[in-house]
Design a protein with these regions (language model features):
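Generic structural detector for well-ordered beta-strands
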Residues: 11-15, 81, 97, 127-129
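Hot-dog-fold acyl-thioester-processing enzymes
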Residues: 1-73, 135-141
């Protein structure tokens, strides 16, 4: 917790592949044909397959768990607003930024967003419990 400050941010990018979409469908059990069937998707207003929204959101989880705050961080809550679809071949850039710190509870509020190019496709906020550095035991003289 002591290493966090307002405005601190981290980001990562990932290009969505067919294997990503199929793998997430298998893991999650969400086999909605909008994700898996070009024939089905072509008949919808979207005209093509899209990635699962929660798969896109998982990049935020990866940032929180691995980079900011990082290992040991525990989700308390997450709000998500899906603004636009993510398609096969899109490169998603996820970003989290510290916008509030609650020192007494070792909690942080993070603004979260995913973009494809300049378009925000997902946004929201997360509250996380952040590990505090434990005091080091004093060495015996």
């Amino acid at each position: 917790f002591e290493d966090l400050s307002l405005g601190l941010s981290e980001s990562m990018s990932h290009t969505i592949t067919d294997a990503d979409i199929k793998g997430f469908a298998e893991l999650s059990g969400d086999r909605n044909p909008i994700h898996l069937s070009e024939e089905f998707a072509a008949k919808t207003f979207l005209k093509t397959r899209i990635a699962h929204g929660i798969y896109t959101a998982s990049f935020i989880s990866a940032l929180i768990g691995m980079r900011l705050p990082g290992p040991g961080a525990i989700y308390i809550s997450q709000s998500l607003f899906f603004r636009a679809p993510v398609r096969l071949g899109d490169t998603v850039t996820a970003k989290v930024e510290v916008v509030e710190l609650m020192a007494e509870k070792c909690r942080a509020r993070l603004a979260c967003a995913c973009k494809v190019g300049d378009e925000v496709v997902l946004e929201g906020e997360a509250w996380v419990k952040v590990p505090s550095r434990l005091p080091r035991p004093e060495k015996a003289a």
